[in-house]
Amino acid sequence: MLKPPRAAALAVAAVLAASAGLPAQARLTTPQQQFGHEIGADYRLPNYRALVDWWQKLAAESDRMELVDIGRTAEGRTQYMAIVSSPANLRDRERYRQTAATLARARVDSAQAVRLSREGKAVVWIDGGLHANEVLGAQQLMETLWQLVSRSDPETLRILDDVIVLFVHANPDGMDLVSNWYTRTPDLQRRSLAALPRLYQKYIGHDNNRDFYASTQPETENMNRVMYTEWYPQIVYNHHQTGPSGTVMFAPPFRDPFNYAFDPLIPTGIDLVGAAMHTRFEAEDKPGVTMRRGANYSTWWNGGLRTTAYFHNMIGLLTETIGSPTPIDIPFIADRQLPRGDLPFPIEPQRWHFRRSIDYSVTANYAVLDLASRYREQFLYRIWRMGMNSIRRGSQDHWTRYPRRLDEVRDSIAARQPQAGANAVMVPGGLVQGAPGPV
C-alpha cells in the first residue's frame, strides 16, 4: 500500500496528465470564478474593467476567441472587439474577412460570387452597451460570448464552424460610469440606476445612437470602420432596452410601412431572421416577445447603428428587452394577454429577475447565429446580390417610387382621362375601361 504523500502525488500527476490532453475550452475561467456570481445575478453589475479582465483571460485560455483593439474611446479607454469562431476559422480569418469584403463590394461576377459564398463564412455583428443605462446590453454580450467559447454541443460547434461572430462593446466609458454608479453603495437593496451624475457618453450621451451617419465620436468611428471598411457583416444585431410594458422583448419584424428605398432583400431578410427568433422563443417556452405593431420601431430612422447598416445592404436587427439587476415586475396589461399576430405567446404578470433577461438575450443571439449558420451561403450571396442591384440602379435611369409621386400620377391620370371612371387601370397601351372592381 502506498504511503499517503506518495499516493497524493500520483493522483495529482494523473489529473495533470489527463487535463493536458483536454481542449482549451475545458480550462476556462468561469463567470463564477471571475466575478463571484453568475452573469445577471440580482444586484450585481460588473463594469467594463471587469469585462476586459475576463475577456483577456478567456482569449489566452481559449482557441475559439481573439481580442482585438479597435481604437480609443472619448475618455481614452481601449474599445475591444472579441472575434469568436472555430480555431480553424480564426487561423484563416483574414481570408474570410477579405471574402466578406469582396462580396459586399460586389466587384465580382455571379460565378465568382457563388464560389466565394461557398468558400466563405457568415459574419455576424452583435453589440451591446451603446446606451449604457440599458445595462442588459453589455451583460448579455458577456454571457453569449461565454457560452460560445465554453459549450461543445452540436449546435454551438456548427455555429463556430460556419460563422465568425464579432462581439463589440459599443460604449466602454458608459459601462464603467453606470456600473460604478449602481454599485457605489454596499447596501444591495438601495442600489439604483437612477440619477446618473453625467452623460454616459462624454459629449453626446444618449444621442450616440444618432451619430452613425455623421460619425463624430471616436467610438462611432471605430465601429463604422469595422463594419463598413473591414469586416462587412451580413447581419448587424444591436441590443437595446427596454421592452414594451406587459412584455419581455420587442424583436423584428418591424412595423409597416417599411422603408421602400432599400433593396427588397433587406425587409425580407429582416423578416426571415425575425421569424427564426420568435420561433426559438416559443420552442424554448419563453413567452412575452412581441413584434411589428407591438412597438413603434421601424426601418425609417437612418442615423442609428442598425439602420445605417441597411444602406450597406446588411440585415440590421434591433431588440428592446426589459430587465435590471434590481428585480422588477411585469405588469398586468389586459390588451397583452390574448395571443395575436404581433404577440403570439403572451406572458402573465410576474416578478422578473435580471438573469431571465440574460437568458432571453442568449436565445435571441443563438437564433440569429443558428440561422446564419444554416443559410451561410445565402447570406453571403445575397449581400453581393444587393450590391449588384445597387450598382445597376445607380448606373442607369430609373423611376424611384415614392408615395407623393404615385399620388401625382393618379392625379395626372384623373385629369387627363376623367371619363375613364374609378375602375380604369393603366396598362402599357393606355387606360382600360371598366376594370373589375373589388371583390
Summary of predicted features, one role per range:
Residues M1-A11:
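Bacterial N-terminal signal peptides that target proteins for export
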Residues A9-S19:
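Bacterial N-terminal signal peptides
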